[in-house]
From Swiss-Prot:
Recorded GO MF terms: structural constituent of ribosome; tRNA binding
Gene: rpsJ
Family, as annotated: Belongs to the universal ribosomal protein uS10 family.
Full protein name: Small ribosomal subunit protein uS10
Alphabetized UniProt keyword annotations: Ribonucleoprotein, Ribosomal protein
Lineage: Bacteria, Pseudomonadati, Pseudomonadota, Alphaproteobacteria, Rickettsiales
Pfam families: Ribosomal_S10
Annotated GO biological process: translation
Disulfide bonds: none
Length: 105
């Protein structure tokens, strides 16, 4: 039976996201576990168009965009030392972390 831990990281700032992935990868490599990644996933770009004036001048508009960057890390056949190392990693406040445990047969 082969287990995997999938870690998805999301952030609006790619620099803090890259720093978080480096910290996780170094923590996992210290436990001598097999790690694949960081795999860059497609970024989501949200664009918003708003009127500059609340009353008239419909043609005068302003556009904003927000980019959500994502990375994927896959840890193959983890041991308890990996889970302990992952729980001790301190990440930046702007990074969202989703951890999935996948058990294969």
């Amino acid at each position: 039976m082969k287990n995997k831990i999938k870690i998805r990281l999301k952030s609006f700032d790619h620099r803090s996201l890259d720093q978080a992935t480096k910290e996780i990868v170094s923590a996992v490599k210290r436990t001598f576990a097999n790690i694949n990644g960081p795999i860059p996933l497609p970024k989501k770009i949200g664009r918003f168009t708003v009127n500059r004036s609340p009353h008239v001048h419909k043609k005068s508009r302003e556009q904003f965009e927000i980019r959500k960057h994502k990375r994927l890390l896959v840890i193959g056949d983890p041991n308890p030392a990996v889970v302990d190392a992952l729980s001790k990693v301190d990440l930046a406040a702007g990074v969202d972390v989703v951890i999935e445990l996948e058990s294969g047969e």
